[in-house]
A protein has these predicted regions:
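Phosphate/dinucleotide-binding and metal-coordinating scaffold of catalytic cores
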Residues: 1-421
Length: 421
């Protein structure tokens, strides 16, 4: 065979090798991807099976509930106060690491009433972030954040889990839920009806006043509409007062101290055509266990359980205070009462770890009493009822899923999944 023929044969052989290699590569990763998706589906099926066969203890009321209920109801009952400045000092002294307020303190009821009633002395835009917020000053120059209402209680937010604007009542519900579950990592929040004309515009700085439209109809009647200043704020989307210029919203007590912002290991891509690695890799947590402190991992698992109950799938970043995780910004919750986005629980079912204290506390509120106690605690709030019955049923349904996932993990890991850190 001449030299030219040998060269042609070599080229053909090389092309065949490349083709076979590419085919092997493609098939390997296709099979791997199919295997990952199959493992996700298998997990979902396993959890459904576990839910159907949950022990009666998860379905019935825990006798210990009544002891916790009475203490909580007493602690969070709003009560009269005399000196707001003293309460501000107490609340600023409360935080320790990520615990924003104590388990029980007689001043809590007074503080809630203070946040609801103290007059607004100054208002300005709070431009940071994607959502409309205002920075208010109450008596004694105490700063608080105000988030206004965008949606009625019964709206169903369609689409992906992070769709829509913030739901203001979700912040109040998160506060009470955190208190019940002893995850006292949220800011203290109360509902409040404010007057857009007399309390916000009248006490607003020039920049805020420039983001409030005043429309006058043919009869000379004024309507005040706020659009504010933020990443997504614009003049086409406004919040308008009613006939008395009132709007609903929530007052969020600003957590004292320095907060550090960190990217969540379970962050979504926020692209419909691209999934994050953790969404398909059920072994994702194995590497995290080697590079993340166990206490931080346990914090994030607590957060995942909390977020799953209220369906907050938008915690792309999380904040820490003194190196412990806090639950800031809970507004993207309670979007669709009919959907349960299981992947919010990924930290739990991928790591199969949970604090023993968290697990014990969850079981106290079995049998439908979790939403019952939050409902009773929030009865004095200005925005009661905070959520609809459909959303309450959703919370109770998801608590059963949490129980089922822990049972699934116990089958895999046994008692070593429970940690005391």
């Amino acid at each position: 065979m001449n030299k030219r023929g040998i060269i042609i044969l070599c080229i053909i052989a090389t092309l065949l090798c490349i083709g076979l290699g590419a085919n092997f590569y493609f098939m390997y990763y296709l099979n791997a991807e199919e295997g990952q998706l199959a493992s996700v589906r298998a997990l979902e099926n396993m959890i459904r099976h576990k839910i159907r066969h949950l022990k009666p203890a998860y379905l019935n009321r825990n006798p210990r509930f009544f002891m916790f209920r009475n203490k909580l109801l007493k602690n969070y009952k709003q009560s009269a106060y005399e000196n707001a400045s003293v309460l501000w000092e107490i609340a600023n002294w409360w935080p320790h690491e990520n615990e924003i307020y104590p388990l029980y303190d007689s001043s809590m009821g007074q503080l809630l009433k203070t946040l609801r009633e103290e007059p607004i002395t100054r208002a300005s835009n709070l431009a940071r972030g994607t959502q409309l917020k205002l920075l208010l000053r109450l008596s004694q120059q105490q700063k608080v954040i105000f988030k206004p209402q965008w949606y009625p209680r019964d709206i169903v937010i369609e689409g992906v889990v992070y769709s829509g604007k913030d739901r203001h009542v979700a912040e109040v519900y998160a506060f009470y839920l955190g208190a019940v579950l002893d995850l006292r990592w949220t800011p203290i929040v109360v509902g409040r009806v404010v007057n857009l004309k007399d309390e916000i515009y009248a006490h607003g700085d020039q920049e805020l006043q420039n983001t409030i439209k005043i429309e006058v109809d043919d009869e000379g009647k004024e309507t005040y509409c706020l659009y504010g200043k933020c990443h997504y704020c614009n003049e086409e989307e406004t919040i308008c007062g009613d006939e008395q210029h009132n709007i609903e919203g929530v007052i969020i007590y600003i957590v004292p101290g320095t907060l550090a912002k960190r990217r969540s290991p379970w962050q979504r891509t926020y692209k419909e055509d691209k999934r994050a690695v953790w969404e398909d890799d059920m072994t994702y947590c194995k590497a995290l266990k080697n590079k993340m402190e166990t206490i931080r991992l346990l914090d994030l698992i607590d957060v995942a359980i909390f977020d799953y109950l209220i369906q907050n799938g938008d915690r792309h970043h999380y904040e820490t205070r003194e190196e412990r995780v806090v639950l800031i910004d809970n507004g993207k919750s309670f979007g669709n009462p009919y959907k349960d986005h299981l992947d919010i629980l990924a930290p739990l079912y991928q790591c199969c770890l949970i604090r023993k204290s968290t697990w014990d506390r969850l079981q106290v509120f079995s049998g439908g009493v979790l939403t019952e106690i939050v409902d009773r605690l929030s009865k004095q709030d200005a925005l009661y009822p905070l959520i609809t019955d459909k959303h309450k049923r959703g919370v109770e349904r998801r608590l059963l899923v949490v129980f089922a996932v822990v049972e699934y993990c116990m089958d895999k890991e046994g008692d070593k999944m429970f940690k005391t850190l």
